[in-house]
Amino acid sequence: WDPYDGLNSKVFQALPFLKKSAICRLVVIQGFKRCPVNLRRLALVPKEYNAKGIGLFLSGYCNLYNAVKANPKLAESLGSPDSLKSRINELAELLISLQSKGYSGACWGYNFDWQARRLFLFPKFTPTVVASNFCATALMEAYEITREKRFLEIALSAAHFVINDLHRTEYKDGFLFSYSPLQ
């Protein structure tokens, strides 16, 4: 589960008058995040993969692999290079399967609806530049270890998402990219 996945609750989704209210969405998000008791089972929040989280785990496994290669004694506690490389391949494939579809290049979003401000809702899987950066960087790190060309190609294609799908706002002598294609 994720601290912000409360809007995936099947109970919440079954109540349209609640899910259409910006205030109710904020209350649910903050309630799930701050409640000392995990309400997710009771509220029927499914366990799902979060692409940004998988990207961070993939980066972590790449770091472990590099540490073991640099200091083979670490293999006793961290795993052999082969076992770590196998896990890197698994996580990279999972990450690739979690891409948001319909954009100019590889991109990733969160597996839940989330609200950035009181009146701005991002539907689940809306790609963001932040999640996409973590995921593309992790795939490049995986490529460095595995030499699986597809990992590099997919990672590099994220630049097409940034260049073609994100909005630009003029700022001083340049511009700023939006956080997502919706802004």
Residues of each region from the PLM?
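Glycan-recognition and catalytic cores of secretory/periplasmic carbohydrate-active enzymes
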Residues: 1-183
